[in-house]
Regions:
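Conserved signal-transmission helix
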Residues: 1-14
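Conserved micro-motifs of the catalytic ATP-binding
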Residues: 76-79, 118-121, 182
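Conserved DHp (HisKA) dimerization/phosphotransfer helix of two-component histidine kinases, i.e.
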Residues: 50-100
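Short beta-strand/loop element within the Bergerat-fold HATPase_c
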Residues: 144-154
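Short conserved segment of the HATPase_c
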Residues: 167-178
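Detector for a conserved hydrophobic position within an alpha-helical segment of the HATPase_c
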Residues: 198-199
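Conserved catalytic submotifs in the C-terminal HATPase_c
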Residues: 107-117
Length: 245
């Protein structure tokens, strides 16, 4: 059993090294090509009026974003942990995301207790993971989004809920796999990156369904006894669990 685990870890390490190498080798010519595009656009501003030129620049932006996401995906387990006061940390990130959607009519509810414990986390990466999950909720054609945190006996329970477009259990399972997305310009790496970061913190992330909650009739205006804001008639419910030690 130990030999099998060691072999698997070696394969994963080789995979990450290969992915890092490919990403690095591709990034250099992409950066160079992008520089050429910028020079061409500067010398020939009329190119901006060309639809094909705009399509090319959009594809280049997508390629650069894909390379950035590949790098993040490959480094999700490389964390720099530090003692972090979770109440101000979680409150700040949940409020910061809303600033990106101030012009949206979406109703947003935040529930973060003031006396959460201090945990050893990588604040930059955990912020990246939770921010991405919240952004997904806001971009899901939702009318309401909620972010709630509850301290349990041995963990912090974070729930992100929206009442946007519904997706099936099969789809939600697939979304944790790399390159699976419903977004037109999505890379399909957002959820895998978030899962990798959370698992690097020895935590877990999963979609919940009506039968897995205490009361599927609860709504964002009617939190259940645990403090979770629930609405499962449509949309999605993500639960993130972070251990206290």
């Amino acid at each position: 059993m130990a030999a099998d685990k060691s072999s698997l870890e070696k394969q994963l390490e080789d995979y990450r090294f290969a992915l890092s190498k490919v990403s690095h080798e591709v990034r250099n010519p992409v950066t160079l090509i992008n520089s050429y595009f910028q020079l061409l656009e500067k010398d020939h501003p009329e190119l901006k009026q060309n639809e094909l030129w705009n399509d090319i620049t959009e594809e280049m932006l997508f390629l650069r974003r894909l390379l950035d996401d590949l790098s993040c995906y490959n480094n999700t387990f490389h964390c720099q942990f530090s003692a972090t006061e979770m109440s101000p940390f979680l409150l700040k990130l949940s409020e910061s995301v809303y600033l990106l959607f101030l012009d949206s009519p979406i109703s947003y509810q935040i529930s973060v207790p003031e006396n959460l414990p201090t945990l050893s986390v990588d604040p930059l990466k955990l912020n990246q993971a939770l921010t991405n999950l919240l952004r997904n909720s806001f971009e899901s054609a939702a009318q309401s989004v909620s972010f709630s945190v509850v301290e349990k006996q041995d963990c912090l329970q974070i729930d992100i809920i929206n009442d946007g477009a519904s997706i099936s259990k099969e789809q939600q399972t697939e979304f944790f796999k790399p390159f699976v997305t419903t977004k037109t310009n999505g890379t399909g790496l957002g959820l895998p990156i978030a899962r990798g970061i959370i698992e690097a913190h020895h935590g877990s992330i999963a979609f919940l369904f009506p039968e897995e909650t205490s009361d599927s009739k609860n709504t964002p205006d009617n939190p259940d006894k645990s403090g979770t804001l629930l609405n499962h008639m449509s949309g999605s419910h993500l639960r993130i669990v972070l251990p206290l030690c």
